[in-house]
From Swiss-Prot:
Catalysed conversion reaction: NAD(+) + ATP = ADP + NADP(+) + H(+)
Main location: cytoplasm
The protein's name: NAD kinase
Keyword field contains Cytoplasm: yes
Gene Ontology molecular-function annotations: ATP binding; metal ion binding; NAD binding; NAD+ kinase activity
Length: 285
């Protein structure tokens, strides 16, 4: 089996783990390749452009935090992804560093299960050409440096949902509900729920609240403003600066992300641990 390995090159712990993984895979007769940036940091000749890894590899290993896993997921397509948490929260990265080798062994033996995670697909135009982006967590349209409050017009299946005067709009999957959407006041949604959540960012309207919709709905968002440029982001990466009245169409992608599951993890325990639920505030700090 051949593994594509993507690491957060800014984390020394991830570098150390990558070297340990290289040694283990070599010892056990398994092949591997790194994306170009990771290979340069590790000074290894086993490298390929990250766009080519999916064609060359049977599975992916992400060494970093949730951001590294999101980055990896954009290129893994249908291949299984083993997420090793070397970050902070680790909602998506299923395994700790100590669980790295056992996770690899499970994949090699074929004795593993998969979490299928839905993605968003956003369609827009650039220079007259239709472009698409896929996002595991969220698609965000925001006001950027625009000095006033724009109006975001949202339609569901062609019917007007509402016009939101706000700093931006977040459209999140159930997976992404614990990311930017949660920080903006959106609900936590259980993974694999067949819904999306639309969360306004700092709405200038007291009655506006996030709304949860069926993930079969087609969402259209346009910006009503006299001028300005408005960033369109997918999973935290800028994809385009939108013009006023330009429309972005968001729907469920046909492609899912296959995350190798850690059967020792419990989602309720993750919420309690990561979000510090039920813990007393330490008054000494």
């Amino acid at each position: 089996m051949k593994f594509g390995i993507v690491i957060n090159t800014s984390r020394e712990r991830a570098i150390t783990l990558a070297r340990e993984l290289m040694a283990w895979l070599t010892e056990h007769g398994q092949d591997y390749v790194f994306d170009t940036e990771s290979a340069l940091r590790l000074q290894t000749a086993r490298t390929a452009p990250i766009e080519e890894l999916n064609k060359q590899c049977d599975a992916f290993v992400s060494l970093g935090g949730d951001g590294t896993l999101l980055f990896t997921s954009h290129y893994s397509v249908t291949k299984p992804v083993i997420g090793i948490n070397v970050g902070y929260l680790g909602f998506l990265t299923e395994f700790s560093p100590d669980e790295m080798v056992p996770a690899i062994e499970k994949v090699l033996s074929g004795n593993y299960s998969i979490h299928n995670r839905s993605q968003l697909e956003a369609t827009f135009r650039t220079d007259g050409k239709i472009e698409q982006l896929r996002a595991l967590n969220d698609v965000v349209i925001e006001k950027g440096t625009y000095p006033r409050i724009p109006t975001f017009v949202i339609k569901l299946d062609g019917e007007l949902l509402g016009s939101y005067r706000a700093d931006g709009i977040i459209i999140a999957t159930s997976t992404g509900s614990t990311a930017y959407s949660m920080s903006a006041g959106g609900p936590i949604i259980a993974p694999k729920s067949s819904v999306f959540v639309i969360t306004p960012i700092c709405p200038h309207m007291l009655t506006v609240r996030p709304i949860v919709i069926n993930d079969e709905k087609i969402i259209e968002v346009s910006i009503d403003a006299p001028d300005g440029e408005f960033p369109l982001n997918g999973d935290g990466h800028l994809r385009k600066l939108l013009a006023p009245q330009e429309t972005v169409t968001v729907k469920k992608s046909q492609q899912v992300i296959n995350l190798v599951a850690n059967e020792n993890r419990d989602y309720c325990e993750i919420l309690r641990t990561k979000l510090l639920w039920g813990r007393e505030h330490d008054s000494t700090q």
